[in-house]
Amino acid sequence: MTTATTLGDAVFSLNMTRGEDILYKSSGAIVAAIVVVVVIIVTLVLILLKMYNRRMRTRRELEPKSPKPPVPPALDPNSNGSQQPAAVTSDPADVPVETR
């Protein structure tokens, strides 16, 4: 609402509410609302991830533990095509003996 007042040669215009003023005054509330929504979304995502992690951990703990199958020699990355037995031999002279 605009009111014009004449006082002699000067014209004074009084703007009660302008569109820009409303935007400036409400911009803080808009930013606060956006921040609140983002915080709520992040909180929900964290809660969902925590529940998923707990569910997967209990599922892993309840599974029967089976030993890993041995890697076939053809798929072993350390083999160069030659069939060498992977045996560990130790010489008793190499083993230190503790004396008291």
UniProtKB/Swiss-Prot annotation:
Intracellular or extracellular location(s): Cell membrane
Membrane-crossing residue ranges in chain numbering: 29-49
Compositionally biased spans, kind Polar residues: 77-87
UniProt keywords, alphabetically: Cell membrane, Glycoprotein, Membrane, Transmembrane, Transmembrane helix
Stretches of the chain found on the membrane's Extracellular side: 1-28
GO terms assigned for molecular function: structural constituent of myelin sheath
GO BP of this protein: peripheral nervous system myelin formation; positive regulation of myelination
Cytoplasmic side: 50-100
Membrane-related topology note: Single-pass type I membrane protein
Post-translational modification: Glycosylated.
GO CC annotation: paranode region of axon; plasma membrane; Schmidt-Lanterman incisure
Tissues expressing this chain: Expressed in the peripheral nervous system Schwann cells (at protein level).
Induction: Up-regulated in Schwann cells by EGR2 during nerve development and after nerve injury.
Region named Disordered: 58-100
Biological role stated in the UniProt entry: Plays a role in myelin formation.
Name of the molecule in the record: Noncompact myelin-associated protein
Source organism per UniProt: Rattus norvegicus (Rat)
